């Protein structure tokens, strides 16, 4: 698929894709994923062509931007590493997020509270999100999926080849997809200027690490405050001592 020059993969985005290990695929390859294989390493790991990944990101973004109501797009991830990315993607593009367990019947059983009628769904992993893909096929909802080289492609209309097991790879693909959607909608006018949002915002963060970091920051803040108080007390004592000496000398 040839893209206009405006949509070409920039060296900066290519470096991001490589740094996030988006190009590291599975050892096994499905038949429909063979065109996305760039090379095979000596250890058996297949390398994904990041150029193909970028082309599919742009194609998916054009499909998403073509839907008038952003809420008709449903972003889904039952995989833990993709839940934060799905929530951020939905916050920036206006899509409807389903982060966590997908309730069976959400697309087919109108009696359930979680019933939805989206015009398009985006899933993080065709395996873990198979229930959503299966129900979408029943009601003719197009499916965009982040697929590894060994991922099943049944009922998937647009497959974005990438490493859908790594937290950095998943977050970066969702980030690039959100950025391209905003550019196509006109929210980001100039393509030469970088987006103010950083890719780190889409990465999964371990709650225990977040709590530990907060405790460390609080400890550092407390230590700084204690040092400031001690310095203030020492300064006050020195001032009082100097005043006492001055009074004694005057007397």
Swiss-Prot record:
Residues 214-251 are annotated as: Disordered. Keywords: Acetylation, Cytoplasm, Ribonucleoprotein, Ribosomal protein. The keyword Zinc-finger does not apply. Residues 214-225 have a biased composition (Low complexity). The keyword Ligase does not apply. InterPro entries: Ribosomal_uS2 (IPR001865), Ribosomal_uS2_CS (IPR018130), Ribosomal_uS2_euk (IPR027498), Ribosomal_uS2_euk/arc (IPR005707), Ribosomal_uS2_flav_dom_sf (IPR023591). Residues 226-251 have a biased composition (Acidic residues). GO terms for molecular function: structural constituent of ribosome. The modification N-acetylserine is found at residue 2. Belongs to the universal ribosomal protein uS2 family. Component of the small ribosomal subunit. Mature ribosomes consist of a small (40S) and a large (60S) subunit. The 40S subunit contains about 33 different proteins and 1 molecule of RNA (18S). The 60S subunit contains about 49 different proteins and 3 molecules of RNA (25S, 5.8S and 5S). Interacts with RPS21. Required for the assembly and/or stability of the 40S ribosomal subunit. Required for the processing of the 20S rRNA-precursor to mature 18S rRNA in a late step of the maturation of 40S ribosomal subunits. This is Small ribosomal subunit protein uS2B. It comes from Vanderwaltozyma polyspora (strain ATCC 22028 / DSM 70294 / BCRC 21397 / CBS 2163 / NBRC 10782 / NRRL Y-8283 / UCD 57-17).
